[in-house]
C-alpha cells in the first residue's frame, strides 16, 4: 500500500480511558464551595482530554507526551480497588460517582464521545474509523458496518445496538463485559470467542477458523497467553473490513505471547496491528517481519495501557 493510500484511512483513535481521582487534597478550598471546586477540576480534566483528542496517535511530539504524562498522573492517584468499586456498583451509585468526581466523570464523558462518533459519524468509501475504548477495546466502523473487540467498560452494553458483531480474545475481565455480551446475544448478534459457548455455536472456535459477516472477512488462530500456564488461551483476530474500505485489515492480538509459530492463520497484509504492551519487554517484536507467522503492518497502535483495575506497573497500570 503506497503512502497516498495509507493516508486515506481515517483513524479516529479517541482514547476513552477513565481515571479515578482517589485523593481529595485539592478539594479543601472554602472560597468557591464544593460545586465550584468540582467545576474547576472538571474543566481542567476536560482541557486535558481535548488536548489528547486533538493530537494524533501516529505523531509522538512534545505536546502529546506532555498530555499523556498528565493523564498518567491522574491514574497514579487511583487505587485499583476504588476503581473496581465504581465498575461493580449499582448504576445509580456509579452515576453519582461520575457527578462527584471529575476524573470518573472523564471516564464517562470520553465513552459518550466515542458513542456519539459511532452513532453519528459518516465513514467515507475507502476509509475506516477506529476508536480506542479504554484499555484494549476497539471499535471499527466502515461505510457498511461496525464491530467491536475486547470491550471492557462500565457502560459497554450501550454499544450493542450499534455494532454488528463482537470479538473477545480471551476470558479475562479486562477484555470483555458480560452485560455487553448478553445484550449482543439478546439481539441475536454474533459474539466471536474461544470460550463463551460450546463449539456447536458457530462463532466459537478453539483453533484456526474463517468467518464472513456482512462484508467483513475474519481469520482467527489460537495462541498462548503471555502469563505462564495459560496455553491456547488467546484468540488472534485478523479482520478484512471489505472492499468499501479498500480492504482495510485490522489485526488484534489480545494478550498473546507473540510466538510466531502459533500465528498460523494471519492475514497476508495488515494495515493496523493492535499489540498488547508486554511486561516482558519487546517480545511483541517477535511477530514483526516477513517470516512464517509474522506480519509487516502499516501502523502499530500499542494498547493495554493504564489498566486501572490492575495494581502494578508490570500489569500495565
Predicted regions and their residues:
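Bacterial N-terminal signal peptides that target proteins for export
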Residues: 1-10
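Core dinuclear metal-dependent hydrolase active-site scaffold
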Residues: 33-161, 203-268, 280
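Non-globular, low-confidence helical/coil segments that flank catalytic cores
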Residues: 63, 70, 182, 187-191, ...
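Active-site metal-binding motif and surrounding structural segment of the metallo-beta-lactamase
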Residues: 152-196, 267-274, 298-299
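Glycine-rich nucleotide phosphate-binding loop and flanking beta-alpha elements
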Residues: 155, 173-174, 199, 280-281, ...
Amino acid at each position: 500500500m503506497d503512502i497516498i493510500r495509507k493516508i486515506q484511512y481515517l483513524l479516529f483513535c479517541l482514547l476513552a480511558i477513565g481515571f479515578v481521582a482517589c485523593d481529595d487534597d485539592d478539594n479543601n478550598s472554602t472560597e468557591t464551595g464544593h460545586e465550584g471546586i468540582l467545576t474547576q477540576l472538571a474543566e481542567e480534566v476536560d482541557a486535558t482530554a481535548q488536548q489528547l483528542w486533538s493530537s494524533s496517535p501516529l505523531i509522538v511530539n512534545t505536546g502529546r507526551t506532555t498530555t499523556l504524562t498528565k493523564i498518567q498522573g491522574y491514574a497514579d492517584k487511583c487505587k485499583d480497588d476504588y476503581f473496581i468499586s465504581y465498575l461493580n456498583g449499582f448504576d445509580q451509585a456509579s452515576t453519582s460517582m461520575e457527578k462527584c468526581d471529575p476524573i470518573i466523570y472523564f471516564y464517562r464523558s470520553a465513552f459518550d464521545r466515542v458513542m456519539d462518533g459511532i452513532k453519528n459519524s459518516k465513514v467515507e468509501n475507502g476509509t475506516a474509523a477506529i476508536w480506542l475504548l479504554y484499555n484494549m477495546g476497539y471499535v471499527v466502523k466502515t461505510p457498511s458496518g461496525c464491530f467491536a473487540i475486547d470491550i471492557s467498560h462500565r457502560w459497554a452494553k450501550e454499544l450493542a445496538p450499534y455494532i454488528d458483531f463482537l470479538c473477545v480474545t480471551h476470558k479475562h475481565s479486562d477484555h470483555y463485559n458480560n452485560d455487553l455480551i448478553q445484550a449482543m446475544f439478546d439481539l441475536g448478534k454474533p459474539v466471536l470467542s474461544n470460550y463463551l459457548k460450546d463449539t456447536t455455536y458457530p462463532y466459537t472456535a478453539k483453533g484456526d477458523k474463517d468467518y464472513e459477516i456482512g462484508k467483513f472477512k475474519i481469520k482467527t488462530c489460537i495462541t498462548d497467553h503471555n502469563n505462564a500456564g495459560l496455553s491456547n488461551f488467546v484468540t488472534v483476530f485478523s479482520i478484512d473490513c471489505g472492499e468499501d474500505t479498500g480492504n482495510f485489515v485490522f489485526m488484534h492480538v489480545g494478550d498473546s505471547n507473540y510466538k510466531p509459530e502459533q500465528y498460523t492463520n494471519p492475514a497476508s497484509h495488515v494495515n493496523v496491528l493492535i499489540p498488547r504492551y508486554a511486561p516482558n519487554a519487546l517480545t511483541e517484536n517477535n511477530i514483526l517481519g516477513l517470516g512464517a507467522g509474522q506480519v509487516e503492518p502499516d501502523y502499530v497502535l500499542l494498547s493495554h495501557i493504564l489498566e486501572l483495575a490492575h495494581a502494578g506497573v508490570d500489569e500495565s497500570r
